[in-house]
């Protein structure tokens, strides 16, 4: 019997629109032709594991630009890539009475602070697990084991 429901944040509770950010960087001369390679070079996975801060990540991004980037604008554009998926917030809220509901997300510190302030993520559900806080990202087993431990989950009763 299912007793626990886990939602992701980006792409589930919040629609991810990163295209404007990529276009902004490309216009500043950052080579965005191979997005997966760029994400590796900039260290996104390390950022989402909490090994580098959002400020450090944006410094790396700015250093890749051929033309100087205004740090405030860069940060604003970095933070402005999510839109609330109202139907998913309603679903998560609606399940709270009958299930234990959690959030599990690959996310860095800066995005988490911004999204929590904007949408109340930490108070929305029974518990949250942000990758930067535990030093592990999906799909590694470590983050799922931490969710099991922290939320006292039984995998067979969790979706």
Regions found by a protein language model. Give the residues of each.
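Hydrophobic "anchor" residues on beta-strands that sit immediately upstream
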Residues: 4, 102, 159
């Amino acid at each position: 019997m299912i007793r626990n429901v886990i939602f992701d944040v980006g792409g589930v509770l919040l629609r991810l629109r990163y295209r404007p950010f990529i276009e902004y960087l490309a216009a500043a001369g950052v080579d965005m032709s191979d997005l997966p390679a760029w994400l590796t070079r900039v260290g996104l996975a390390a950022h989402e594991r909490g090994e580098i801060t959002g400020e450090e990540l944006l410094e790396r991004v700015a250093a890749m630009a051929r033309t100087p980037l205004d740090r405030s604008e860069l940060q604003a554009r970095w933070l402005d890539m999510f839109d609330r998926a109202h139907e998913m917030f309603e679903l998560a809220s609606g399940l709270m009475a009958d299930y234990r509901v959690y959030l599990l997300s690959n996310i860095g510190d800066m995005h988490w602070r911004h999204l929590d302030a904007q949408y109340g993520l930490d108070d929305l559900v029974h518990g949250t697990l942000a990758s930067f806080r535990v030093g592990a990202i999906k799909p590694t087993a470590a983050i799922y084991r931490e969710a099991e431990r922290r939320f006292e989950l039984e995998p067979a009763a969790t979706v």
